[in-house]
Each structure stands twice: as C-alpha cells, then as structure tokens.
C-alpha cells in the first residue's frame, strides 16, 4: 500500500521509512507528487498533524501519514513547541537546523533548568474525510546540552542529552536513536494501530 508522507523533510522520511518497513508500506513524500505543504495554523502538534495528513490525502487520493514534532523547553513554558522549525527566525536567523540549535543555545546561555522534551505526534488517515484518524504520540525527556555534540541525526539531536545514555541523540548509533527517540516511540505506537485497524 502506498502512503503519502505529509512532509518533504528527508530526515523524517528516512526515519519513518525504516520504522514502517515491517508493514510493507511504500512511503512517498508529498513533494514527489507535487503536493504543496499544508498550512499549520494550530497551537498543538495533533491539530497540525491532522491538518497535514488530511491535506496530503485530499491532494493525492491516497492514505496519508503526518508527523508534527517539536522541542518543548521547560524554562520557556513549553516553547518553541509547534513553532520549532521556525525557532531561529525569531532571533534574526534563517530557518534551518543549525540556526535553530545556535538560537536555542544563545537563549539558554544563562538558564540553569535545561529540562526539555522532544515530542512527535503521528496522524494517519485513510482518506481526507476519515472519521477515525490514527493518532500516536511519542515523547522523550532530556536536557539541553551546553554545546552540540555528535554527528548523527538532525534537528536538535546534537543538543538533546538523554540521561539514561549520557549522550546526545546525535552521538547514538542510528538504530539506538530510532529505538529511543520521540519519533521512534510514536512510530511503534502507530505500527500497532495500523496493524490493529488497517490490516
């Protein structure tokens, strides 16, 4: 079965392809089908993910999977949250992973409470009008490191220090990261839901 990923993010595509491989789904990006990105006007991950999944399904006629994910920093009241991808732009930088990390470290320079969570919300729909979307959430709590460490992953992986490993996500082998990441946890829950309700 073909499923459209409501994203053009290559990092997300690679992770989700690997995680959904056991079901035999062919995951293709919306960009491959010429589908524009959906607006994300909401304040919660689940609302944005649902809007993106419905948008991709409406434009493709195929089932769709969307991920809305972000970093929620305790010292910032849970922000940047759904605005994570654009975090750097608030501080005069261009949008991008490296700039997001740079801006975060600058804003947290004198902050002692470094607790943060990476959150991934996956939503899958069979069609644009699917009355029963599948919703899976994964969450990992860690601490923001004082400097980037590691060369794997993307996003905030180089500064997301995971206490049980004593390393950032970017230092962990890909298999270990995927098994323990917010997206990995959400994908495992989504796999179970898809097996139960779609297969």
Swiss-Prot record:
Q: Which domain of life is it from?
A: Bacteria
The record's note on quaternary structure and interaction partners says: Homodimer.
| Keywords associated with the record | Hydrolase, Magnesium, Metal-binding, Nucleotide metabolism, Nucleotide-binding
- Please name the catalytic residues of this protein: 68
Q: What does this protein do?
A: Pyrophosphatase that catalyzes the hydrolysis of nucleoside triphosphates to their monophosphate derivatives, with a high preference for the non-canonical purine nucleotides XTP (xanthosine triphosphate), dITP (deoxyinosine triphosphate) and ITP. Seems to function as a house-cleaning enzyme that removes non-canonical purine nucleotides from the nucleotide pool, thus preventing their incorporation into DNA/RNA and avoiding chromosomal lesions.
Q: Name one Pfam family in it.
A: Ham1p_like
**Cofactors that this protein relies on:** Mg(2+)
GO annotation (BP), single: purine nucleoside triphosphate catabolic process
- State how the cofactor is bound: Binds 1 Mg(2+) ion per subunit.
| Gene3D superfamilies given in the database record | 3.90.950.10
**Amino acids binding substrate:** 7-12, 69, 154-157, 177, 182-183
Source organism phylogeny: Bacteria, Pseudomonadati, Pseudomonadota, Betaproteobacteria, Burkholderiales
Record-listed Mg(2+) binding positions: 68
Q: What GO MF annotations does this protein's record show?
A: dITP diphosphatase activity; ITP diphosphatase activity; metal ion binding; nucleotide binding; ribonucleoside triphosphate phosphatase activity; XTP diphosphatase activity
Give the UniProt family note: Belongs to the HAM1 NTPase family.
Catalyzed chemical reaction(s): XTP + H2O = XMP + diphosphate + H(+); dITP + H2O = dIMP + diphosphate + H(+); ITP + H2O = IMP + diphosphate + H(+)
GO cellular-component terms in the record? cytosol
Record protein name field: dITP/XTP pyrophosphatase
EC numbers, comma separated: 3.6.1.66
């Amino acid at each position: 079965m073909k499923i459209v990923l409501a994203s053009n993010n290559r990092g997300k595509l690679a992770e989700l392809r690997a995680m959904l491989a056991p079901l035999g789904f062919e995951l293709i990006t919306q960009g491959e089908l010429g589908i524009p990105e959906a607006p994300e006007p909401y304040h919660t991950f689940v609302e944005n993910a649902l809007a993106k999944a419905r948008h991709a399904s409406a434009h493709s006629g195929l089932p769709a999977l969307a991920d809305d994910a972000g970093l929620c920093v305790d010292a910032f009241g849970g922000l940047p949250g759904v605005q994570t991808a654009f975090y750097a732009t608030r501080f005069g930088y261009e949008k991008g992973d490296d700039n997001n990390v740079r801006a975060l470290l600058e804003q947290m320079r004198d902050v002692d409470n470094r607790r943060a969570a990476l959150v991934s919300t996956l939503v899958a729909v069979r069609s644009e009008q699917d009355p029963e979307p599948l919703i899976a959430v994964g969450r990992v709590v860690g601490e923001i490191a004082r400097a980037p460490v590691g060369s794997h992953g993307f996003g905030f992986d180089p500064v997301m220090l995971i206490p049980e490993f004593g390393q950032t996500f970017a230092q962990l082998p890909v298999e270990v990261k995927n098994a323990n990441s917010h997206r990995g946890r959400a994908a495992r829950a989504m796999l179970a839901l898809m097996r139960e309700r779609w297969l």
